[in-house]
């Protein structure tokens, strides 16, 4: 499993709208692609401008197979409906490793 981890800066007064539009537009589009497993939105109660998106993919290849044109089109639709650009301030990729549990 691969984790796509994005930290964004969003105006505090627009945070709820951002989360709603992100679910309607981005999550819907991502979920239509093979390999999409789930997505979570984390908010930091101490930093009202911070939103973290945690997206789980079955494989890196499936994640990276989304056509760039589709990403650009989705970004354009999101910007048009949200009305403001959310700034990605940090992004990372993680692999989830699981090892057999040793019984004692």
Where are each of the predicted segments found?
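Short, surface-exposed ligand-recognition loops at beta-strand->loop->(often short) alpha-helix junctions
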Residues: 9-22
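Short, well-ordered beta-strand segments in beta-rich or mixed alpha/beta enzyme
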Residues: 2-9, 39-69
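Short, low-order "capping/linker" segments at domain edges
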Residues: 95-104
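An amphipathic, aromatic/His-enriched active-site/gating alpha helix that lines ligand/cofactor pockets
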Residues: 24-36, 56-92
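Short acidic/polar alpha-helix capping motifs at helix-coil junctions
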Residues: 2-5, 15-16, 93
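Intrinsically disordered, low-complexity regions of eukaryotic proteins
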Residues: 6, 42, 89-95
């Amino acid at each position: 499993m691969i984790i796509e981890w994005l930290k964004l800066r969003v105006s505090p007064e627009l945070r709820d709208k951002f989360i709603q539009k992100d679910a309607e537009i981005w999550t819907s589009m991502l979920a239509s692609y093979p390999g999409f497993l789930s997505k979570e939105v984390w908010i930091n109660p101490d930093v009202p401008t911070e939103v973290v998106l945690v997206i789980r993919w079955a494989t890196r290849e499936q994640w990276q197979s989304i056509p760039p044109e589709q990403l650009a089109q989705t970004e354009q639709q999101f910007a048009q409906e949200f009305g403001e650009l959310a700034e990605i301030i940090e992004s990372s990729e993680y692999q989830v490793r699981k090892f057999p549990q040793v019984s004692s």
